[in-house]
């Protein structure tokens, strides 16, 4: 396939046009008075959203050179979303401003490499300043304020704060669609997995059709249990030791005479045991069984480690305060495992989350982490139409991410003002000279853009507001929702420092690379062949 090239100033201008097309589409959504964008979908209803990354993903430019610029900024939004989960619009606005200011200087003869150095140094200084001024989140009302600001809904803020309170910072909060109106919270304590009892005869509560085991022994087996001869020695030891203590068996499968013996003993009232299948498949099943073993203090019985069921003693069994088993689910509450072992396992899963590239793997690891660390909250969201439902779901997911980021690194004043105040550390150009000093100045000018557009979207003169905010003390700023100046943290207008920091760092990373670009290479569009078979008609 032939390629076509563009060089020098022409190339950079084409990239800038693409950057502007994407950023102009996204920046109308920033701030409490930002607008929405409607995205046409090939199938189903259109999507209405104010989520920067969702909009960015949909933008493709006709011109292949401009499209390169748009794709680069899309990368800014996506990366910020991956790291902080929110702040994608802020990142896009910053990238546009950095590109605009930077290219102006490159066109005037500044060295792109020196500009890049200056930009990188300035961003590092501003990031450090933001982290210094960050205030750790210590109570529920702060969490509610962060979530409410991101979701633009106070009730949702309080709901997320409650969910965070229940599951802790490692817990999982998922958003599901519901058929009813409004938003509800559903909390599952302990470790739950989606496998139920193997026989309905095992239930202890006929009315609710569930088996509740108080203070049971827990046997975890990696393979299938088919022969009662394998299980008998262990059952006898359990009866001798615990008398009436129930037993939960988690295995790949319990079948044949082993299952029928358990059921018969349960019906006769001689012994209470409940068998469930292990969740997941393959390596994931092994990992989840390992998690359960750590949580309950059990040892996984597996041929590969030389442990056989018929030789196992009571020391391989785990314990828990209570286990509830329904037709479809099993929940283990307060496992009897060693707290240090559980923390070690949590640290191991966190390390795996850091190192994985796959979103699917990351999601599954997060779920495992949550089950070990405390619990799972499901927020069910409903709305009048499918379009509104999707929009609310987007907002909720953003708000949860923002809240997590806030708990991690703390909060700064919101509404774009934290950046305006943080760039004051650049007033002496960090002691740089020449084009490097110009690079520092580029960051200083670009940092006011998020605040400017928050004000513009509220129908005000952007630069007038940014100048006024720059004169205020740290922590003070402009509240676009009320149109007043004041202490933003007190007013509940706060941003997670991780979101603001990631937005700036990712925007600068792409912008400084874009400034050092000299050539663009794109594929030559295929020429359409003229259709054959049409003769020339002549009129005489």
UniProtKB/Swiss-Prot annotation:
UniProt KW Isomerase keyword: yes
Coiled coil residues, start to end: none
Reactions listed under catalytic activity: ATP + H2O + a folded polypeptide = ADP + phosphate + an unfolded polypeptide
EC number: 5.6.1.7
CDD domains the record matches: GroEL (cd03344)
Gene3D superfamilies (UniProt xref): GroEL, GroEL-like equatorial domain, TCP-1-like chaperonin intermediate domain
Gene Ontology MF terms in the entry: ATP binding; ATP-dependent protein folding chaperone; isomerase activity; unfolded protein binding
Keywords for the protein's UniProt record, in alphabetical order: ATP-binding, Chaperone, Cytoplasm, Isomerase, Nucleotide-binding
Pfam families referenced in this protein's UniProt entry, alphabetically: Cpn60_TCP1
Main localization, broad class: cytoplasm
Binding-site residues for ATP, renumbered to this chain: 29-32, 86-90, 415, 479-481, 495
Enzyme class name: isomerase
GO annotation, cellular component aspect: cytoplasm
Disulfide links within the chain: none
GO biological process entries: protein refolding
Top-level taxon of origin: Bacteria
Family (UniProt): Belongs to the chaperonin (HSP60) family.
Quaternary state and interactors: Forms a cylinder of 14 subunits composed of two heptameric rings stacked back-to-back. Interacts with the co-chaperonin GroES.
Function in brief: Together with its co-chaperonin GroES, plays an essential role in assisting protein folding. The GroEL-GroES system forms a nano-cage that allows encapsulation of the non-native substrate proteins and provides a physical environment optimized to promote and accelerate protein folding.
Protein name per its UniProtKB record: Chaperonin GroEL 1
Organism: Streptomyces albus G
């Amino acid at each position: 396939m032939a390629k076509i090239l563009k060089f020098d100033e022409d190339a950079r201008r084409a990239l800038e046009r693409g950057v502007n097309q994407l950023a102009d589409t996204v920046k109308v959504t920033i701030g409490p008075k930002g607008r929405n964008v409607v995205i046409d979908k090939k199938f189903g209803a259109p999507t209405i959203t104010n989520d920067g990354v969702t909009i960015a993903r949909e933008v493709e430019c006709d011109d292949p050179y401009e499209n390169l610029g748009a794709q680069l900024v899309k990368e800014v939004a996506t990366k910020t979303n991956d790291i902080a989960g929110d702040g994608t619009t802020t990142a896009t606005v910053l990238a546009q401003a950095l590109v605009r200011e930077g290219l102006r200087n490159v066109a005037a003869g500044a060295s792109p490499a020196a500009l890049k150095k200056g930009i990188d140094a300035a961003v590092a200084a501003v990031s450090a300043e933001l982290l210094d001024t960050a205030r750790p989140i210590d109570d529920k009302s702060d969490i509610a304020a962060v979530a409410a600001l991101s979701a633009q809904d106070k009730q949702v803020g309080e709901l997320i704060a409650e969910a965070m309170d229940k599951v802790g910072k490692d817990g999982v909060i998922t958003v599901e669609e519901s058929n009813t109106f409004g938003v509800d919270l559903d909390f599952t304590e302990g470790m739950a997995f989606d496998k139920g009892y193997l026989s309905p005869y095992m239930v202890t509560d006929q009315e609710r059709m569930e088996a509740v085991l108080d203070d049971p022994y827990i046997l975890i087996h990696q393979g299938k249990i088919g022969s009662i001869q394998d299980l008998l020695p262990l059952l006898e030891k359990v009866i001798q030791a615990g008398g009436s203590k129930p037993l939960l068996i988690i295995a790949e499968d319990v079948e044949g005479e082993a299952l029928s013996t358990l059921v018969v003993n349960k019906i006769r009232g001689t012994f209470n045991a409940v068998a469930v299948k292990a969740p997941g498949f393959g390596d994931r099943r092994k990992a989840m069984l390992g998690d359960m073993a750590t949580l309950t203090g059990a040892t996984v019985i597996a041929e590969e480690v030389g442990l056989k069921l018929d030789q196992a003693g009571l020391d391989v069994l785990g314990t828990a305060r209570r286990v509830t088993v329904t037709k479809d689910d099993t929940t283990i509450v307060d496992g009897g495992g060693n707290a240090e072992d559980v923390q070690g396992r949590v640290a191991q899963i966190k390390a795996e989350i850091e190192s994985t590239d796959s979103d699917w793997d990351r999601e599954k690891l997060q779920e495992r982490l949550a089950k070990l660390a405390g619990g799972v909250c499901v927020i069910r969201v409903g709305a009048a139409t499918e379009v509104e439902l999707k929009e609310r779901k987007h907002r909720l997911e953003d708000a949860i991410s923002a809240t997590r980021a806030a708990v991690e690194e703390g909060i700064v004043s919101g509404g774009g003002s934290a950046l305006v105040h943080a760039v004051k550390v650049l007033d002496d150009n960090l002691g740089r000279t020449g084009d490097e000093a110009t690079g520092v100045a580029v960051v200083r000018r670009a940092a006011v853009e998020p605040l400017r557009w928050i004000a513009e979207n509220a129908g005000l003169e952007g630069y007038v507001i940014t100048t006024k905010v720059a004169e205020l003390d740290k922590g003070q700023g402009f509240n676009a929702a009320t149109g007043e100046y004041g202490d933003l943290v007190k007013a509940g207008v706060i941003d997670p420092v991780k979101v603001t920091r990631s937005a700036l760092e990712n925007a600068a990373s792409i912008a400084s690379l874009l400034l050092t670009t000299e050539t663009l290479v794109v594929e030559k569009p295929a020429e359409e062949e003229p259709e054959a078979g049409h003769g020339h008609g002549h009129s005489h």
